[in-house]
């Protein structure tokens, strides 16, 4: 019985976190997941910045919308992180740039938001 346990252990791969995984994640896929995780985190911070801009101007409907968008992006990032952990992978958090915080008008902010989302969808 001990011999069977030893043979089974040899068939199991372990990820960097020490958790057993069925199959290691391909490096290029892992790099893409980390890149997407970083994009989700940046979008979270950027949408939060937009929320603050509207909140400071008592534009509560817009503020509520962008707060919801910010929370949604954080949930997306969390799902990617949870997936990596479930696969036995340590999560690497890359640095994200500071968000834009000033706009001259509502139209400029909405346009910025649209262009940011469009660029994320391209990648």
Roles of regions detected by a PLM:
Residues 1-123:
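Iron-associated oxidoreductase/ferritin-like identity signal
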């Amino acid at each position: 019985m001990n011999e069977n346990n030893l043979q089974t252990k040899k068939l199991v791969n372990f990820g960097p976190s020490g958790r057993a995984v069925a199959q290691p994640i391909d490096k290029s896929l892992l790099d893409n997941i980390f890149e997407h995780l970083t994009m989700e985190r940046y979008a979270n911070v950027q949408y939060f910045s937009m929320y603050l801009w509207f909140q400071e101007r008592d534009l509560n409907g817009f503020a509520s919308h962008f707060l919801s968008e910010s929370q949604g992006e954080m949930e997306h990032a969390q799902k990617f992180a949870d997936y990596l952990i479930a696969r036995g992978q340590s999560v690497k958090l890359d640095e994200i740039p500071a968000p834009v915080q000033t706009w001259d008008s509502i139209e400029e902010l909405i346009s910025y938001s649209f262009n940011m989302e469009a660029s994320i969808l391209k990648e």
